[in-house]
Design a protein with these regions (language model features):
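Formylglycine-dependent sulfatase
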Residues: 2-5, 15-422, 430-471
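Sec-dependent N-terminal signal peptides
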Residues: 7-10
Length: 471
């Protein structure tokens, strides 16, 4: 029933638009930039003039969330429109499943050309990898298996290449060259640009580090990386204007999770790795001159799983016939200025799993040596369903956001299998300091409804995790 409902929901926008009328899409994502790590959100030191300008001219989301509290799962949510636990992407270093349908695959069927640039972190850099960018719908890719630093190695469609320069600028230059070729063909495009900044280790080039000469060395490098990324965003915006495609290009910027210890949460509770606001609320801005004529700020809830259905609706493309259950919802009404409240609650779930470390340069250097020797190894299997998960035990920290209210379900450390609950009103208490649960009878019905909704959603996620969506 849920899948049929989704298909009916999109039927009204499924009429395919002529190619010339379809917007282009650029999805930019920072790596570990917290909610408070921008000038426009009040950082007292950090210089982000381009992001500040975007926040003044575009649509600024003040309640936008990463679908997970760490990187790989969030990236998987962007690609699929689904909570990452549905396809077993529990933590950093986990991959997509080959059965998933990505936004690149869906837009390719609608006539788009697709490119990925920068951090991938949800699959192999080998061309034959089941979850490589190429086997996830991208026509062209200059990608890194994880975070990357200056003068990075990239995998270009599976072949290792060298680059020279500040990491964000190198990534942007590659993307602009590719966009220029798409513009010459007059073909709508999807460019996914996932920066390596400001993930540690922090090594800013002198030009940007010098801007923070009065700060401790570590902070100067951290701030310098963000300002360098900001400047690269500026080059991207200038570049698409010069190419004449800016007016009908949707440029969507956000981060993959909340702040790291050196970063700023802007006063929100906790940091990267936590489902409290400081771990998942992230900066987010959309620019689209053809549609967003003046600055708007929205407090409507949104998250990275919404990107997939939003782009498909904007492209006038139907959902694939075999589309698995979506967690995201289209934010087109927000772009059109016609929505103030999100009707669909948002679920978040940190499933208890250890991450898998990936050292980008070492992995790509190993691949390069294999290629130079003419003895490239086959990619390892990725995204396999290796077990069945029970639906009666739902471990880990989960949250359920419905309007202004956020319910936490937290495992009790001393008593395995038991959970404690907390409730916060994000409009009045964004820092999540005042737990509203107790003897408040006025909230009893709401809490019961939220608990029921969260439990049903978790069971749905486990069914997806066990492969039900692919049968």
């Amino acid at each position: 029933m849920k899948r049929n409902f989704i298909l009916v929901l999109f039927a009204a926008v499924a009429m395919v638009k002529p190619l010339a009328e379809r917007p282009n899409f650029i999805l930019c994502m920072a790596d570990d930039q917290g909610w408070g790590d921008t000038g426009y959100n009040g950082h007292p030191i950090l210089k982000t003039p381009v992001m500040d300008e975007m926040a003044r001219s575009g649509l600024r989301f003040d309640r936008f969330y990463s679908a997970a509290a760490v990187c790989s799962p969030t990236r998987g949510s962007v690609m699929t429109g689904r909570n990452p636990n549905r396809f077993g992407c529990f933590a950093w270093g986990y991959t997509l499943r080959p059965q998933e349908i990505t936004i690149a695959e869906a837009l390719k069927k609608a006539g788009y050309t697709t490119g990925h640039f920068g951090k991938w972190h949800i699959g192999s850099m080998r061309a034959d990898g089941a979850a490589s960018p190429g086997n996830s719908g991208f026509d062209d890719w200059f990608s890194s298996p994880n975070f990357y630093e200056n003068s990075p190695l990239f995998s270009h469609n599976g072949q290792v290449i060298e680059t020279d320069g500040e990491s964000s600028h190198v990534t942007t230059a590659l993307a602009l060259d590719w966009i220029a070729n798409a513009a010459k063909r007059d073909q709508p495009f999807l460019a996914v640009i996932w920066f390596g900044n400001p993930h540690s280790p922090h090594v800013a080039v002198d030009k940007y580090k010098k801007m923070y000469a009065d700060q401790p060395d570590g902070a100067a490098h951290f701030y310098g990386e963000i300002t360098a990324m900001d400047a690269a965003l500026g080059e991207l915006r200038k570049g698409i204007r010069k190419l004449g495609v800016a007016d009908n290009t949707v440029l969507w910027y956000c981060s993959d999770n909340g702040a790291i210890p050196r970063g700023s949460t802007g006063g929100l509770r906790a940091r990267k790795g936590s489902l409290y606001e400081g771990g998942i609320r992230v900066p987010a801005i959309i620019e689209w001159p053809a549609r967003i004529k003046s600055n708007r700020i929205t407090n409507m809830n949104g998250n990275t799983s919404d990107i997939y259905p939003t782009l498909l609706e904007l492209a006038g493309a139907p959902l694939p016939k075999n589309q698995p259950v979506l967690d995201g919802t289209s934010l087109v009404p927000v772009l059109n200025g016609k929505a103030m409240r999100r009707e669909k609650p948002m679920g978040f779930w940190t499933y208890q799993a250890k991450g898998h470390g990936r050292k980008s340069r070492a992995m790509l250097e190993e691949l390069r040596q294999e290629q130079l020797a003419g003895n490239q190894k086959p990619a390892e299997p990725e995204g396999q369903i290796d077990r069945q998960y029970p639906t009666d035990t739902l471990p880990g920290h989960t949250t359920w956001i419905d309007g202004d209210y956020k319910l936490h379900r937290l495992p009790v450390k001393k008593n395995k299998g038991e959970f404690a609950y907390e409730l916060y009103h994000l409009g009045n208490d964004p820092g999540e300091q005042q737990n509203l649960l107790g003897n408040n009878e006025k909230l009893a019905k709401r809490v019961a409804r939220m608990k029921t909704g969260l439990a049903a959603w978790q069971k749905s996620v486990v069914k997806s995790l066990n492969g039900d969506d692919y049968r």
